Amino acid sequence: MDAGMNNTSSHYKTQARCPLQEHFLPRKPSKENLDRFIPNRSAMNFDYAHFALTEGRKGKDQTAAVSSPSKEAYRKQLAETMNLNHTRILAFRNKPQAPVELLPSNHSASLHQQPKSVKPRRYIPQTSERTLDAPDIVDDFYLNLLDWGSANVLAIALDHTVYLWDASTGSTSELVTIDEEKGPVTSINWAPDGRHVAVGLNNSEVQLWDSASNRQLRTLKGGHQSRVGSLAWNNHILTTGGMDGLIINNDVRIRSPIVETYRGHTQEVCGLKWSGSGQQLASGGNDNVVHIWDRSVASSNSTTQWLHRLEEHTSAVKALAWCPFQANLLATGGGGGDRTIKFWNTHTGACLNSVDTGSQVCSLLWSKNERELLSSHGFTQNQLTLWKYPSMVKMAELTGHTSRVLYMAQSPDGCTVASAAGDETLRFWNVFGVPETAKKAAPKAVSEPFSHVNRIR
């Protein structure tokens, strides 16, 4: 069982803040902590300084009169050898660190002779590009309160209210505020069309909203007995996961939407993800179990509905991510008692690799452009870690959050990642870079599955 709700009150709550406004932090002091007008004594050569102020001037006057090209070259070489080629007597900053020799000189020389072109290493910013306030975000490991739609609009649930932030314009709007007896909001997920959004509630209901008209289309109820903490779309099928351990497939086109119910988890379902093909569903629960469900074999009437039951994790599994470049490859992350990222072949059910990250794994995202995986973590560093796949070498660690990074979402072009944490901030990171083929995401037309939903309540 993993740590769920964090009741520790944040110091940010001492004053009211507007949601999704720029968050300004006090400027951090310089690491060197030097005054611009006071020399740094530890970086100065006092012997040379004394020589330059006394005898150095005399030497220059004498050599100027009898200067020759050969003597001048000798003087420069001698200055370099004796480390006397200074331009300043007073040092106002530390010397830059010498570059590390990664290869012996003979190897590096041979490499320079080869005409083979080497791809330059991508620059990964270590700080967030933008930080927005997210007051009253629920600090609960088992919920899913952030999603970025295909129309480039980010949805975030803050307590009882769902806000929409348009990444193209930077504008913010309120979609809905849930009644006190029904809330707070416990999950949110965009439909593939980027216009319709599902909102899971604490009272076991799920609401469907049209973001273009700010209108509620229908309410799904009766399937779950407790809060709905996870949602996942598969075309016209909305899959919901509840604290009751049930997973329900809802066909939003029909009046009685429940078409399948999966039973396998004994505790809350906190993670749901459909594969890119829409054929397999991965679910993670507070029972430390990952299930792989296949629509072609799963049936509500069968005793064993799942394709695979994966029990190697030792803590709650919320973080799930299907690989975009390799079929049947799933990454899963375990909670504070597990701390591992595991990779699975969902065709055979075999565990391909397991990596100890050292801290609670809250969320996982694959890069759409490179063979890279991003993970978000809790105590002690509350960092985002970028991994190279399949070597799982750390490429970067991004810090800035002061509480566990519970939620992550990826922009439609795959370049930017948004992260939300219990510190009540929403941060944006240019972690995956800008591919040459990246194009601005255009809003998609409303898909056919919702053509009849307006008439169903």
Swiss-Prot record:
<dbReference type="GO" id="GO:0019900">
    <property type="term" value="F:kinase binding"/>
</dbReference>
<dbReference type="Pfam" id="PF24807">
    <property type="entry name" value="WD40_CDC20-Fz"/>
</dbReference>
<keyword id="KW-0131">Cell cycle</keyword>
<dbReference type="GO" id="GO:0033597">
    <property type="term" value="C:mitotic checkpoint complex"/>
</dbReference>
<dbReference type="GO" id="GO:0016567">
    <property type="term" value="P:protein ubiquitination"/>
</dbReference>
<dbReference type="InterPro" id="IPR056150">
    <property type="entry name" value="WD40_CDC20-Fz"/>
</dbReference>
<feature type="repeat" description="WD 4">
    <location>
        <begin position="264"/>
        <end position="303"/>
    </location>
</feature>
<keyword id="KW-0833">Ubl conjugation pathway</keyword>
<keyword id="KW-0853">WD repeat</keyword>
<dbReference type="GO" id="GO:0010997">
    <property type="term" value="F:anaphase-promoting complex binding"/>
</dbReference>
<feature type="repeat" description="WD 5">
    <location>
        <begin position="312"/>
        <end position="354"/>
    </location>
</feature>
<feature type="repeat" description="WD 6">
    <location>
        <begin position="356"/>
        <end position="397"/>
    </location>
</feature>
<feature type="repeat" description="WD 1">
    <location>
        <begin position="138"/>
        <end position="175"/>
    </location>
</feature>
<dbReference type="InterPro" id="IPR001680">
    <property type="entry name" value="WD40_rpt"/>
</dbReference>
<feature type="repeat" description="WD 2">
    <location>
        <begin position="180"/>
        <end position="219"/>
    </location>
</feature>
<keyword id="KW-0498">Mitosis</keyword>
<dbReference type="GO" id="GO:0051301">
    <property type="term" value="P:cell division"/>
</dbReference>
<keyword id="KW-0539">Nucleus</keyword>
<comment type="subunit">
    <text>The APC/C is composed of at least 11 subunits that stay tightly associated throughout the cell cycle. Interacts with APC10, FZR1, FZR2, FZR3. Binds to GIG1 and PYM. Part of the mitotic checkpoint complex (MCC); interacts with MAD2, BUB3.1, BUBR1 and BUB1. Binds to cyclins CYCA1-2, CYCB2-1 and CYCB2-2. Interacts with PANS1.</text>
</comment>
<feature type="repeat" description="WD 3">
    <location>
        <begin position="223"/>
        <end position="260"/>
    </location>
</feature>
<comment type="similarity">
    <text>Belongs to the WD repeat CDC20/Fizzy family.</text>
</comment>
<dbReference type="InterPro" id="IPR033010">
    <property type="entry name" value="Cdc20/Fizzy"/>
</dbReference>
<dbReference type="InterPro" id="IPR019775">
    <property type="entry name" value="WD40_repeat_CS"/>
</dbReference>
<comment type="function">
    <text>Component of the anaphase promoting complex/cyclosome (APC/C), a cell cycle-regulated E3 ubiquitin-protein ligase complex that controls progression through mitosis and the G1 phase of the cell cycle.</text>
</comment>
<keyword id="KW-0132">Cell division</keyword>
<dbReference type="InterPro" id="IPR036322">
    <property type="entry name" value="WD40_repeat_dom_sf"/>
</dbReference>
<protein>
    <recommendedName>
        <fullName>Cell division cycle 20.1, cofactor of APC complex</fullName>
    </recommendedName>
</protein>
<keyword id="KW-0677">Repeat</keyword>
<dbReference type="GO" id="GO:0005634">
    <property type="term" value="C:nucleus"/>
</dbReference>
<dbReference type="GO" id="GO:0097027">
    <property type="term" value="F:ubiquitin-protein transferase activator activity"/>
</dbReference>
<comment type="pathway">
    <text>Protein modification; protein ubiquitination.</text>
</comment>
<dbReference type="InterPro" id="IPR015943">
    <property type="entry name" value="WD40/YVTN_repeat-like_dom_sf"/>
</dbReference>
<feature type="repeat" description="WD 7">
    <location>
        <begin position="400"/>
        <end position="439"/>
    </location>
</feature>
